[in-house]
Amino acid sequence: MMIGALHITRGVQTLIDDNKIQYEEIWELVHRHASMDYGDVEDDSVELNNSNINHNYGTILSSYQLHNIKIWICTTLTEEVQDIYTIVMLPEEY
């Protein structure tokens, strides 16, 4: 799956700055997300993610636990490749 431009929210950046998580760990999660390993999401979310990928439109949401911190990765797919983007965020930043 194409992830487009990658953005990290202020909350995630603060966790990195405070050494609670590492950039390398975020990259591992992004790789899992791009490989269609959505982490801890319900079966209906997996089905929706896969349908959105097949239609190349919509939102792909993954959820992971990293050091007891929930991390969400959200990709927005559009028909225009240059408009695809991915955000690494905390759930409360959604």
Please identify what each model-predicted range represents.
Residues 1-61:
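Compact soluble domain cores
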Residues 56-94:
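Short, compact, well-ordered microdomains
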